[in-house]
Amino acid sequence: MVLGRGLLGRWSVAELGAVCARLGLGPALLGSLHHLGLRKSLTVDQGTMKVELLPALTDNYMYLLIDEDTKEAAIVDPVQPQKVVETARKHGVKLTTVLTTHHHWDHAGGNEKLVKLEPGLKVYGGDDRIGALTHKVTHLSTLQVGSLHVKCLSTPCHTSGHICYFVTKPNSPEPPAVFTGDTLFVAGCGKFYEGTADEMYKALLEVLGRLPADTRVYCGHEYTINNLKFARHVEPDNTAVREKLAWAKEKYSIGEPTVPSTIAEEFTYNPFMRVREKTVQQHAGETEPVATMRAIRKEKDQFKMPRD
């Protein structure tokens, strides 16, 4: 689907969203809106910690993490470096740090260019395949972005070196944040390219699932609607799934992100976080959480997405 600039000049983003939703063209709309610069960014002010969501490529997110106390900033997965530099300048912050969740091109592919644009950046990641890497981290490694504390969480499965970054402001009541790359999505999880169901179970339930319930979840892609359609298939009577899906469709229709969620919310509608629930196990025909994880991931990989 191609949307001409003349069409965009006559219709608002919301009107285009409504038309494409009626025609079952949601994914095409999102890609088109992005390429014409209309997929919206969002700034989440959590207190001292500020997070700007930067749409990238077709459905990726980069995240500018800002410490308001020191005006120091980090960027998560900067696949479009020029956009990152311009956004940092807009906020008047000093970009010091790159937090790379994993080595895939749509997350790490901008690292080399960014370090040329901004010499002296510290580039963190858990995999030697990450471009421009200066600081290799492991599980529970820590670092600072200004006054913000960052803890590295190893979550191998999507890739063997995948890291999630858990960010807190010490001695502050503001909620934490976790940048989950392609491990945890809103209502979903990443494909098991280099790992197993057991590893994803540990990543979701034993690592991320044990973070504070109010932790904001900033994931790597805008996959929420399709994830919730699968969640609805798994648990058709789950009210939380249906309510979140209706909300996400509304956000999508006006070009707004569905991120962040929270850890607490994910336990109510994400089937991969709910593999200990009897309803999910019964759908999978299993009685054990890891086997359920394996079964529903295999099913989702082959799932024909409804067009509603």
UniProtKB/Swiss-Prot annotation:
Quick check: keyword Acetylation in the entry?
Answer: yes
In which pathway is this protein known to take part?
Secondary metabolite metabolism; methylglyoxal degradation; (R)-lactate from methylglyoxal: step 2/2
Q: Which residues bind substrate?
A: K191, F192, Y193, H221, E222, Y223, R297, K298, E299, K300
Name what cofactor the protein needs: Zn(2+)
* CC per GO annotation: mitochondrial matrix; mitochondrion
UniProt xrefs under InterPro entries: Clx_II_MBL (IPR035680), HAGH_C (IPR032282), Hydroxyacylglutathione_Hdrlase (IPR017782), Metallo-B-lactamas (IPR001279), RibonucZ/Hydroxyglut_hydro (IPR036866)
**From the Swiss-Prot or TrEMBL record, what is one GO molecular function term?**
metal ion binding
Q: Which residues bind Zn(2+) 2?
A: D106, H107, D182, H221
Q: Which GO terms describe its biological process?
A: glutathione metabolic process; methylglyoxal catabolic process to D-lactate via S-lactoyl-glutathione
Q: How is the cofactor bound?
A: Binds 2 Zn(2+) ions per subunit.
List of residues that carry N6-acetyllysine = K116, K229
- Report if keyword Electron transport is assigned: no
Per the record, residues carrying N6-succinyllysine are K229
> Which residues are recorded as binding Zn(2+) 1?
H102, H104, H158, D182
- Please provide an example of a Pfam family that matches this protein in its UniProt record: Lactamase_B
Query: What keywords does the record list, in alphabetical order?
Result: Acetylation, Cytoplasm, Hydrolase, Metal-binding, Mitochondrion, Transit peptide, Zinc
The reactions it catalyses are: an S-(2-hydroxyacyl)glutathione + H2O = a 2-hydroxy carboxylate + glutathione + H(+); (R)-S-lactoylglutathione + H2O = (R)-lactate + glutathione + H(+)
Q: What is its EC number?
A: 3.1.2.6
Q: Which family does it belong to?
A: Belongs to the metallo-beta-lactamase superfamily. Glyoxalase II family.
What do we know about how this protein assembles, alone or with others?
A: Monomer.
NCBIfam families attached here?
GSH_gloB
Function of the protein: Thiolesterase that catalyzes the hydrolysis of S-D-lactoyl-glutathione to form glutathione and D-lactic acid.
* PANTHER family named in the record: BETA LACTAMASE DOMAIN (PTHR11935), HYDROXYACYLGLUTATHIONE HYDROLASE, MITOCHONDRIAL (PTHR11935:SF80)
Listed name of the protein:
Hydroxyacylglutathione hydrolase, mitochondrial
Q: Please name the taxonomic classification of the source.
A: Eukaryota, Metazoa, Chordata, Craniata, Vertebrata
Gene, per the UniProt record: HAGH
